[in-house]
Structure formats: C-alpha cells, structure tokens
Curated annotation (Swiss-Prot):
Cell compartments where the protein resides: Cytoplasm
EC number: 3.6.1.31
Main localization category: cytoplasm
Cited HAMAP family: HisE
Record keywords: Amino-acid biosynthesis, ATP-binding, Cytoplasm, Histidine biosynthesis, Hydrolase, Nucleotide-binding
Protein known as: Phosphoribosyl-ATP pyrophosphatase
Keyword Nucleotide-binding: yes
Taxonomic superkingdom: Bacteria
Gene assigned in the entry: hisE
UniProt-listed Pfam families: PRA-PH
Organism annotation: Albidiferax ferrireducens (strain ATCC BAA-621 / DSM 15236 / T118)
Catalytic activity: 1-(5-phospho-beta-D-ribosyl)-ATP + H2O = 1-(5-phospho-beta-D-ribosyl)-5'-AMP + diphosphate + H(+)
Family, per entry: Belongs to the PRA-PH family.
Entry keyword annotation includes Cytoplasm: yes
Length: 130
C-alpha cells in the first residue's frame, strides 16, 4: 500500500477528471464514458453502482472459495469509480467521504448505528423540524 498522500492525490485527481466531464463543464457524451453516464442522468450511473456492488460481492465470494483475490480489488475500483461519478453529480467529492469517515473514527460501528436509529426516530416525531 502506498502512502495516504498518494492515495488522496489519486482520488483527488480522478475526481477532477470526473468533474470536468459534467455537462455544465462541457463533458461530451460522444467522446467520454463518464460524460455519457452523467448525460443520461442518475438512473444510468446508479444502475452501474448497483451492478458494480454486485460484482464486488461475487468476487469476494469467489475469493472465499479459492478464487483470485485481486479480482476483489478490480471490482472495488469499478465500484469506487462509479460512486465518484455519483458524488460529482451531487456536487460532492471523495474528500467529503473522507471527512465523514474521519468523523466516525473512534466510534464503534454498533454505537454509530444506534445513533442513526435515535436520530431517525427523533425526525419522525410530530412537530420535528423538517
């Protein structure tokens, strides 16, 4: 594994390339796969995210049964890539995801999930701020 800075730089660079393919930035759906997905709208890239997530699961199951573990990396890369397209569409970046992961650092997954349930219940209360 390379240094975190290198990982951050790679994600930031890829995010900039994806952002350059947004329709409002002149992305050309005739010459760019990313621009084509963005031009088609959320249903197109969200469908790809679902497909790629399924492929991650299948690669992991194969790896559990003696298959090539590097295929998990390949499929996760596809999933991350398509998730980054979604982030760009919604005006977000990988840095926003890292901030959220940092916020969760040191918090038990069980505790974090319990807090989400409490927050959801509070939001459902009559008179809750909308």
């Amino acid at each position: 594994m390379t240094a975190n800075t290198s990982t951050s730089d790679t994600l930031a660079h890829l995010a900039r390339v994806i952002e350059s393919r947004l329709p409002q930035n002149g992305g050309d759906p005739d010459t760019s796969y990313v621009a084509r997905l963005l031009h088609k709208g959320p249903n197109a890239f969200l469908k790809k995210i679902g497909e790629e997530a399924t492929e991650v699961v299948m690669a992991a199951k194969d790896a559990d049964n003696g298959g090539d573990k590097t295929k998990v990396v390949y499929e996760v890369a596809d999933l991350w890539f398509h998730c980054m397209i979604a982030l760009a569409h919604y005006g977000l970046s990988p840095a926003d995801v890292v901030v959220e992961l940092d916020r969760r650092a040191g918090t038990s997954g069980i505790e974090e999930k319990a807090m989400r349930k409490v927050t959801a219940r509070e939001d459902e209360q009559p008179g809750a701020a909308q």
